[in-house]
Amino acid sequence: MEESQGYLELYKSGQHDFLYPLIFQEYIYVLAHDHGLNRSILLENLGSDNKFSSLIVKRLITRMYQQNRLIISANDSNQNPFLGHNKDLYSQIISEGFAVIVEIPFPLRLVSSLERKEIVKSHNLRSIHSVFPFLEDKFLHLNYVSDILIPHPIHLEILVQTLRYWVKDASSLHLLRFFLYEYRNWNSLINPKKSIFVFSKRNQRLFLFLYNSHVYEYESVFVFLRNQSSHLRSTSSGALLERIYFYGKIKHLVEVFANDFQAILWLFKDTFVHYVRYQGKSILASKGTPLLMNKWKYYLVNFWQCNFYVWSQPVRIYINQLSNHSLYFLGYISSVGLNPSVVRNQMLENSFIIDNAIKKFDIIVPIIPLIGSLAKAKFCNVLGHPISKPARADSSDSDIIDRFVRICRNLSHYHSGSSKKKSLYRIKYILRLSCARTLARKHKSPVRAFLKRLGSELLEEFLTEEEQVLSLIVPASSTSRRLYRGRIWYLDIICINDLANHE
């Protein structure tokens, strides 16, 4: 959102047709590919009156070009971009440019929505970890959870139709429709053999945007039904509905929905229903009965098929009881268990033993899938025994260590919310010994002799920032070190490490 800030100021002038001219500016695709650009230049010299001017845009993209040598040249290929052998490259370039352009109107809607709801530090809500404290507070009081596999649209035209409510630029939508139809048969866009919508890594930004736009349409109706059927209205659900990728959030729907759905609201008188979406799936948790959960199940299936033209089946929604079911969610295994405790009550000459059970929300790291991810990346075998990385043997020692340390710290950072740290210690051991084996293989030395020569230097490299600070200022037996072994949630994690994602 920051990299488009300069264009947002121009968009505020009311020129809604501003998007279409940007599509044909080759510099916009440089912006799409750039990640290290000094974004402050977008905030400078926008003009005193902030009116729309193609000259302002030209000056901005010229300044960006002066700091970026990555430019799309027509001489790179004489092939037709849609028919030539470079179609994968051009698909990536065009889709990333489209994604940057169509995202421009949405940050303004988000900012205005957050200002109305007086939400401070909204960037913290984008963190994946911000979901888990919510689950800790709510799931202890709920009984059932539904694992929902979100259906994908059966036709690309549905995605374009969804954007009509957000982007008032018919020319841009027509060109987007042409682009989607031109590539609709490519395996890199949609794989028809799978039951869910699959995004290409090369076109991920655009198609995640289109997919989230489509899903948000029926989620808006879902939030409306939830608020209408609940005596406790939620004022912030519009901003907290999707925290990861999607920008546009709204507060209310048009009043026509009240007439369409009033007849079925009596089915869903549930004041404790919570919804979370992630990675093409969603979770619907409730304090209600199995009958109520089944009503939600069949209603969602009919709602998707009749109103949004997506194919779904009841078997795609699994209803489980939280007390005896573990939930695999964003790289963690979450469960609600009972923590038994015995209380002795003394009354005069009589004493009583009272058995008491307290619900506890437990979150652990799934060690077997994580080791499987490490084995797939060639850090260890399927049994978890560390192996060397021959592909890294031609790098310098410092580069090899930095790469292993970066992976180790990223995994530790993401899985810091685990209530059991022993699994993380095993992962650190695998990465540390794999790094040592890689270095020993490079220097043609035995691993034991190489570790003896390095001593504790290699071990210190793999310590996280928190462990380094605690090792300096906190004694090993203090309560602060025991506190570190508890769950820690970070508000700066907006993506999942590939090794942590076992989906």
Swiss-Prot record:
Which GO terms fall under biological process for this protein?
mRNA processing; RNA splicing; tRNA processing
Q: Where in the cell is it found?
A: Plastid, Chloroplast
Q: Which GO terms describe its molecular function?
A: RNA binding
Ranges annotated as spanning the membrane:
none
Q: InterPro entries from the xrefs?
A: Domain_X, Maturase_MatK, Maturase_MatK_N
What Gene Ontology terms describe where this protein resides (cellular component)?
A: chloroplast
| Domain of life of the organism encoding this protein | Eukaryota
Q: Which UniProt keywords apply?
A: Chloroplast, mRNA processing, Plastid, RNA-binding, tRNA processing
- Family as reported in the entry's similarity comment: Belongs to the intron maturase 2 family. MatK subfamily.
Q: What does this protein do?
A: Usually encoded in the trnK tRNA gene intron. Probably assists in splicing its own and other chloroplast group II introns.
Output this protein's name. Maturase K
Q: Supply the source organism for this entry.
A: Liquidambar orientalis
